[in-house]
């Protein structure tokens, strides 16, 4: 089906041990070039996070889709100087993703102070063809969710006017136990 093909291939990720902050820094450099100083980009990283077994390019795409949406939402505001996007990493202990309990996960947060996601869209934003912008394709977050799922991860969103947080959870442990 066409939508499935647009969401990306179903091939397995090309996994390698990768520093998650390298992924976030690549996204940050791309967004800073696009924003041209119109927003503040804040980095709040936990330096103790070990390398993860991930597909670096896929994770860059997943995070870039979220951060680019935040930039576009902030650009729609009248006063661009107040726009702020934060990239934050932390570790969490004993966290369940799906039916699997993980001893340790990395939590990446993309936080912005934009207008928020309308309540009527919040339950469906990860579905294909759902967009909050008239010119949006509605594929970015569906692709992001697909990539995170391929990495046995979880993505969540919490939003209200002035504060939107996308949280990505990726397992750090390879020996998780079903719960």
Name what the model sees in each region.
Residues 140, 144:
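Short alpha-helical Gxxx[C/S/T] motif in the catalytic ATP-binding
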Residues 1-34:
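Conserved DHp (HisKA) dimerization/phosphotransfer helix of two-component histidine kinases, i.e.
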Residues 40-50, 92:
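Conserved catalytic submotifs in the C-terminal HATPase_c
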Residues 11-14, 51-54, 132:
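Conserved micro-motifs of the catalytic ATP-binding
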Residues 148-149:
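Detector for a conserved hydrophobic position within an alpha-helical segment of the HATPase_c
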Residues 103-105, 117-128:
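Short conserved segment of the HATPase_c
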Residues 81-95:
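Short beta-strand/loop element within the Bergerat-fold HATPase_c
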């Amino acid at each position: 089906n066409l939508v499935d093909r647009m969401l990306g291939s179903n091939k397995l990720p090309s996994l390698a041990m990768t520093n998650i902050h390298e992924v976030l820094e690549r996204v940050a450099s791309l967004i800073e070039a696009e924003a041209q100083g119109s927003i503040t980009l804040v980095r709040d990283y936990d330096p103790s996070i070990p390398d993860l077994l991930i597909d670096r390019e896929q994770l860059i795409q997943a995070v870039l889709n979220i951060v680019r949406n935040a930039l576009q939402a902030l650009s729609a505001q009248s006063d661009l100087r107040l726009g702020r996007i934060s990239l934050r990493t932390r570790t969490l202990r004993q966290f369940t993703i799906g039916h699997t309990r993980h001893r340790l996960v990395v939590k990446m947060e993309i936080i912005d102070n934009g207008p928020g996601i309308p309540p009527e869209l919040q339950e469906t934003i990860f579905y294909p063809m759902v967009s909050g912008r008239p010119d949006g394709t509605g594929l970015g977050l569906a692709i992001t969710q697909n990539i995170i799922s391929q990495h046995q991860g979880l993505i969540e969103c919490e939003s209200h006017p002035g504060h939107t947080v996308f949280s990505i959870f990726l397992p750090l442990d390879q020996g998780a136990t079903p719960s």
